[in-house]
A protein has these predicted regions:
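Carbohydrate-interacting regions of secretory-pathway proteins
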Residues: 23-245
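Bacterial N-terminal signal peptides that target proteins for export
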Residues: 1-13
Length: 245
């Protein structure tokens, strides 16, 4: 992540998320070839409570502490693209307990992230929100540490090696948040699980740079965020959410 101061076919992607969705906290993500032309979701996904967060208008997003979508973000052919350094995007809605699924692709040396349960109390969303790290492990310096490699809960919980696909290939990710329990999945494999507020979590946060921000990770409800402040390109597709009731 290194903050500053301030294809696979659709069928393969769906099959990966079928495995990813089979968690202790959430139900499986249904797979199908019958895709809705308006939402980008399959009929089974829609029936199962999934909702797409992407459409050409980007009406479900805005800039962090802004009212509109900032320069640098665009949507075409089902793909959300960030070009160059841009302000972070946040969802207009807030979410508490949910499954968030998405496909992502980075160029060689690429670096980005997806935040969850973020607030706008600080200057940057990453001071309040845990981050699912997106990274080209092979070429970016952050890939030298599992704490900051692809799929990690950035700088707090490490991810295992050998799961992320090479640069310029699509990866499929799933984040499951239910109460204080969180899971990160990548390409059908569970990477990590942690409990917010546990003694282990408290110790890890205390040992991280986030100790400077008392409310880091503590919101029970917040925004989904897409990191834009690094140079380079980020591509996202099939971004969808299912709230856990």
């Amino acid at each position: 992540m290194m903050h500053g101061t301030a294809a696979r076919t659709a069928i393969i992607g769906q099959l990966a998320l079928v495995v990813a969705g089979c968690t202790q906290m959430g139900n499986s993500v249904p797979a199908s070839n019958s895709t809705s032309s308006t939402s980008g979701l399959t009929a089974e996904q829609t029936a199962g409570g999934w909702r797409s967060l992407l459409d050409p208008s980007l009406a479900q997003w805005r800039g962090y502490k802004q009212q509109t979508v900032p320069t640098g973000w665009s949507f075409a052919n089902g793909v959300l693209t960030k070009t160059g350094s841009a302000e972070d995007l946040v969802s207009k809605d807030q979410y508490g307990n949910f499954e968030l699924a998405f496909d992502w692709k980075l160029p060689p040396g690429g670096n980005a992230g997806v935040f969850y349960r973020g607030t706008e109390e600080y200057d940057h969303i990453y001071w309040s929100a845990p981050e699912y790290q997106l990274l080209d492990d092979a070429r970016h310096p952050d890939g030298k540490s599992r704490l900051t490699s692809a799929g990690a809960d950035y700088a707090v919980y490490p991810s295992p090696a050998g799961v992320v696909k090479p640069a310029d290939e699509w990866n499929s990710s799933l984040i499951v948040v239910n109460g204080n329990r969180v899971q990160h999945w990548l390409n059908g494999q569970k990477l990590l699980e942690y409990e917010i507020g546990s003694s282990d979590w408290e110790a890890k946060v205390k040992a991280s740079k986030f100790v400077a921000y008392p409310n880091y990770g503590r919101a029970s409800r917040g925004y989904i965020g897409l990191q834009g402040d690094h140079d380079g390109t980020l591509q996202l597709r099939n971004v969808r959410i299912r709230e856990i009731k």
